[in-house]
C-alpha cells in the first residue's frame, strides 16, 4: 500500500477518533481504517500558501517552497519517495502524534503530517533524481523551517481546525 493511501486511512480513522473524543466517547475499539471516500481536489496551493505565511528563517528555503508550489500546480505525486518520507512521518508520529494524547487533538497532528508529506514529496518530485543526501537535507530543512517556532505550530493548528480547506475530505482528495 502506498504512503499516500496510508495517509488517507490515517486521516479518515483519526477524524472518527477525534469526533469520538470531542463527544467524550472513550470506548474507541476496533474501528475499520479503510472507510473513506476519495474525491478529487487536486489543488494543493492552499497548503503551500499556509507554509509561505509561517515564520521561515531561511530565504533560500522560502524560494524553494515557491518553486515547489509552482511545480505542484502541474504535476502529481508518485510513490518513488515513499521510503524516506515514511521514515520522516515516523518521526512525526513520535514527535507530535504521541503527544496529542494530552491535548485530545489527534486530527490536527495527522493533518500536520499530511501537509509535511505534500510539501516535501512535491519538492522531491521537482528535483527528479535527488541524492540520498539531498533527500535528507530536504526533510531536515522542512523540519527546521516549520518546527522551530511555537507560533508556527499554533498557526498550523488553527488553520487545521478552522479553515475548511484543511478538512479531512479535502486533504484526502489531494492525496
Which stretches of residues belong to each language-model region?
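Hydrophobic, aromatic-lined core segments that form the binding pocket/scaffold
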Residues: 2-175
Amino acid at each position: 500500500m502506498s504512503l499516500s493511501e496510508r495517509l488517507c486511512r490515517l486521516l479518515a480513522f483519526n477524524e472518527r477518533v477525534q469526533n469520538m473524543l470531542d463527544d467524550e466517547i472513550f470506548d474507541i475499539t476496533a474501528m475499520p481504517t479503510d472507510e473513506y471516500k476519495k474525491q478529487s481536489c487536486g489543488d494543493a496551493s492552499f497548503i503551500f500558501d499556509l507554509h509561505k505565511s509561517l515564520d521561515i528563517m531561511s530565504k533560500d528555503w522560502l524560494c524553494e517552497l515557491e518553486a515547489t508550489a509552482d511545480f505542484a500546480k502541474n504535476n502529481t505525486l508518485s510513490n518513488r519517495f515513499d521510503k524516506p518520507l515514511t521514515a520522516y512521518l515516523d518521526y512525526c508520529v513520535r514527535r507530535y502524534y504521541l503527544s496529542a494524547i494530552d491535548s485530545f487533538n489527534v486530527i490536527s497532528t495527522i493533518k500536520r503530517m499530511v501537509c509535511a508529506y505534500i510539501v516535501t514529496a512535491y519538492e522531491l518530485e521537482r528535483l527528479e533524481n535527488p541524492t540520498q543526501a539531498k533527500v535528507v537535507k530536504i526533510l531536515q530543512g522542512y523540519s527546521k523551517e516549520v518546527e522551530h517556532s511555537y507560533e508556527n505550530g499554533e498557526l498550523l493548528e488553527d488553520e487545521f481546525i478552522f479553515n475548511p480547506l484543511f478538512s479531512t475530505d479535502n486533504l484526502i482528495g489531494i492525496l
